[in-house]
Swiss-Prot record:
One of its GO terms (molecular function) is 5S rRNA binding. The gene is rplY. Keywords: Ribonucleoprotein, Ribosomal protein, RNA-binding, rRNA-binding. The keyword RNA-binding applies. GO terms for biological process: translation. It comes from Geotalea daltonii (strain DSM 22248 / JCM 15807 / FRC-32). Part of the 50S ribosomal subunit; part of the 5S rRNA/L5/L18/L25 subcomplex. Contacts the 5S rRNA. Binds to the 5S rRNA independently of L5 and L18. Pfam families: Ribosomal_L25p (PF01386), Ribosomal_TL5_C (PF14693). This is one of the proteins that binds to the 5S RNA in the ribosome where it forms part of the central protuberance. Signal peptide: none annotated. It comes from the Bacteria. One of its GO terms (cellular component) is cytosolic large ribosomal subunit. This is Large ribosomal subunit protein bL25. NCBIfam families: bL25_bact_ctc. The keyword rRNA-binding applies.
Length: 196
């Protein structure tokens, strides 16, 4: 996963009024926290954050902070992003300080590869788990996890435990949890027989 720059400004004032003021000036409030540092309130440009987390890896991009005094040069990932439910615009961001030598837990998107055999037979794809939690070094975070569904037949599922092991990546979660299934098509009811 590539590293990106994110400009931040330290802020001493907090609260709803300050947050509204920041949003009117196309900025958002945020907080940086993590091992070895106290939580620090920051502000950053909305568009810059959107650009930094755009693309395939989304929130899992490693971001290097600039302009934040003691935070300058710190590496973070987006731990939480509060967005406007109607407009989708960021309202607040939590940035988690990381160390490239320490493993972290993140959620990555599931990317389906191929067309399931059961779908070709008329079944319906039930995509139950769009993201999977993994644990790895920050430099090993994949943009997504590929799940090959070509051999998936009617009435069968692919579970977390069925995933191929990837070097340096531990897949977390219940091994029996279903990621994707092919559901059988509904049986057509027989037409009622007309009485003579």
């Amino acid at each position: 996963m590539d590293q990106r720059i994110l400009n931040v400004e330290l802020r001493s004032k907090t609260g709803k009024g300050i947050s509204r003021q920041l949003r009117r000036s196309e900025s958002i409030p945020g907080v940086v926290y993590g091992k070895g540092i106290e939580s620090v309130s920051v502000s950053l440009k909305t568009k810059e954050l959107s650009n930094a987390i755009a693309g395939e890896g989304g929130r899992n991009h490693i971001l290097t902070l600039k302009g934040g005094g003691s935070l300058d040069g710190q590496m973070v990932i987006v731990a939480d992003l509060l967005q406007d439910s109607l407009k989708g615009l960021p309202l607040h961001v939590d940035l988690h300080k990381i160390n490239l030598a320490d493993k972290i837990k993140v959620k990555v998107k599931v990317n389906l590869v191929g067309t399931a055999a059961g779908v070709k037979e008329g079944g319906l794809l039930d995509f139950a788990m769009h993201e999977i939690e993994i644990e790895c070094l920050p430099s090993h975070i994949p943009e997504h996890l590929d799940v090959d569904v070509t051999s998936l037949t009617l009435g069968h599922s692919i579970h977390i435990g069925d995933l191929k092991e990837l070097p340096g990546i531990k897949v977390l979660g219940d091994p029996k949890a279903s990621i994707i299934s092919v559901l059988g098509r509904a049986k057509e009811e027989a037409a009622p027989v007309a009485e003579a």
